[in-house]
Structure formats: C-alpha cells, structure tokens
Amino acid sequence: MLPDRKEAESFLRESEEIHPGPWADHCRTAAECAEKIARNCSGLDPEKAYIIGLLHDIGRRIETGTHFKHIVDGYECMMEYGYDEVARVCMTHSFQIKNIESYVGKIDVPEEKSEMARTFLNHIELDDYDLLIQLCDAIALPEGPVSMEKRLRDIEERYGSYPEDKRQRCYELKAYFEEKMGRSLYDVIGVDEITLP
C-alpha cells in the first residue's frame, strides 16, 4: 500500500519540520529522478516511483536517525501507517549489495534491529522499484541530480569510504536502467554530460 502523492509530500514536509536538514531536498531530487526514469521504462508506474523515492529516507525525520538507524526507523514508521511498499524501499535503498555489512556508516541500532534488517534482506528478491530507488539515491543531491561519480564522492567524503563493490553495483544499475530506457540516464534526468562528473 502507498500514500497518494499529496499525502507523501505532506508527510515529508511535516517530517522536515520535525528534523530540518538537506535530507528532505535529497529525497525530493530522488523522487523527481525516479518519476522521470519510470516514465521511460515499460512496466514501472511513475507515480509509485515518485512516492517511494520521496519517502525512502523518511527515517531521518527522527533526529537520531542519521546512520543505519534511519533505515530501520523509516521501515517501522511506514509499516505503522500501513505503507508496506514504502517501508520495503526504506529498508532496501542502501543495499545495492544485499547484506547489512555493506552499509556505509555506523550500525547504530541494537542487535535485534540489525538482525531484523538482515532477515528482511535475506528473504526478499529486489524488484525494479528497489533497484530504481538505489539508483536514484546514487544520483541525488539536495541541490538536484548529479553524476553518479559526484554523488558517490559526496558519500565518501562524509563517511570516509565507499566500497568498490558497491560503487561497481551502482554503475551496473545505471547500465541496467539505461538499457531499459534505451537512453542515457543523464539525458533523462537532465544532467549535462559535458560537465560531468
């Protein structure tokens, strides 16, 4: 189940008031990118793509939800509202490699929460919506869409590293969606390839 677009936008605005920060504009950028990409892919609903992109980091509405905790908090918050399709993406968006050890940042939750996340990831098959939001997370800055290299450098600067296997997986996602669209990702999202990275 999903909120509608207006509900999702309202929920993000309210969450931004609770815990202001650049995370909310990052979510808006990811949502806009997801909608544009979905419009160019058969079998993907642009409205759903926008909504799940908009709320993928909603766990950051809780002030302490800065590292791994934002994943679990987002999942639990969306499940409380009955938005299981959003909750799923809250859980999967940081795991291009499907294990919690691949997380870039601190595992700042109790063991039972990290075990819940591990079990969740072990028992699902990532679908194209999961993959789409992983891709959009890797090209979205608060100021707007950027090259993947620029966004991954941003993460690396903030967290100290970005593992090569995750970096490679991000580029595989880019290639996967470019093949589905039959177009350059950067053309679709409006990033000028001349100015890359």
Enumerate the language-model features and the residues they cover.
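Acidic-glycine-rich active-site phosphate/pyrophosphate-binding loop
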Residues: 1-8, 48
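Generic N-terminal amphipathic, Lys/Arg-enriched alpha-helix
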Residues: 5-20
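Divalent metal-dependent catalytic cores for phosphoryl transfer on phosphate-bearing substrates
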Residues: 13-16, 40-155
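A short, charge-rich alpha-helical start-of-domain segment used by transcription regulators
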Residues: 22-24
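Conserved alpha-helix/loop element of class I SAM-dependent methyltransferases that forms part
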Residues: 33
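Charged phosphate-binding loop/patch that engages nucleotide di/tri-phosphates or the phosphate backbone
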Residues: 161-197
